[in-house]
Amino acid sequence: FHAGLRQSEDILDHCTQEGIGFIPWFPLGNRALVAPDGPLAHIAARHDCTPAQVALAWLLQRSPVVLPIPGTGSLAHLRENCDAALVTLDPEAMAELQTAPEMA
């Protein structure tokens, strides 16, 4: 479950209703989703962050029960992932991500 593949919306909605933690599989999606010139790049530019931070911020704002566990290969990447919690996506970005065509 990530911004490019939202097939578990009904499960997430149920978890949110019941207060059950939801750990999305592969929260950053594929490389194309979070590439510097990928589909999240324009949202990242508007919010002064990276596409990966947009993907994680969307998950964190989507529901308070979402617990993304992104992988990391370096300290810089870990910081980038953690800083996603500081990104607040505007309502337009949230709506765009919620209705964007899916990409596995």
For each of these PLM feature ranges, what is it?
Residues F1-A104:
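Beta/alpha (TIM)-barrel catalytic core signal, keyed to glycine-rich beta->alpha loops juxtaposed to Asp/Glu
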